[in-house]
Amino acid sequence: MKLKIFTKNSPDAIEFSKYVKNLAENLGFKITENDPDVVLVIGGDGTLLRAVKDGIPILGVKFGRRSALLDIRPENIKEALELLQKNKYTIEEYPMLEAKSKNINTIAFNEIAILFNNPETVYGSVNIKERKILFEGDGVLIATPQGSWAWSYSATRVLLHKDINGIEITFINPIIPNIKALIIPQTETILVKLEDKGRTQNVRVISDGEIVGNLISKEDEELTITLSKRKAKILRFFNLIEFDGLFT
């Protein structure tokens, strides 16, 4: 079996990754950068975000300050690798979002964010079927269930259980807080538009913390967000307690 090791950029994690590499090779695994069967992630949820989007199964070692989804502790890595050899694991799948405009094509594990580029409010709309919801504030987040545990949680203090087939729309610091958050089915298509503010708006589009492009109102750009056909896959060897790691 071919393993790729993806490590958090910290001295402790890098040193631990050397130990894991030797351990895996001694157990008969082949370490590779290309076409792996499993990606072994050493870090926290931020490291996971950078490794998970290709849909290759993830073996995650909790080596970060906070991790809600990586459940293998460093002292259990040998046991996990031995279980991997014996195919004694389950695969947990997580939904991802796809966002497209004429200049943007991205996949997000946690969330898509539309945020101001300058220190002023964003005036726009979220369109779902025939329903148009206007908003003005710092922006809007479109989050998966696992994404509701992250940035969206900071704004709403609401957690969406991973088994709920929903998408959470969060309005960030709205001027008129008539709607703070909205949960819709994952089957819906979401269209985000910039509305007429009397001057050109230029806002950032952010996918899992990375700026992937801009929307400009004068060009009448729209961002379409749908459920991706691609699933993130995380291998489970032990029981993961829901929401464990979020508050510690």
Curated annotation (Swiss-Prot):
Its cofactor is a divalent metal cation. Keywords: ATP-binding, Cytoplasm, Kinase, NAD, NADP, Nucleotide-binding, Transferase. One of its GO terms (cellular component) is cytoplasm. It is found in: Cytoplasm. It is an enzyme of class 2 (transferase). One of its GO terms (biological process) is NADP biosynthetic process. Signal peptide: none annotated. Its EC number is 2.7.1.23. Pfam families: NAD_kinase (PF01513), NAD_kinase_C (PF20143). The keyword Oxidoreductase does not apply. The active site is at D45. Belongs to the NAD kinase family. This is NAD kinase. The gene is nadK.
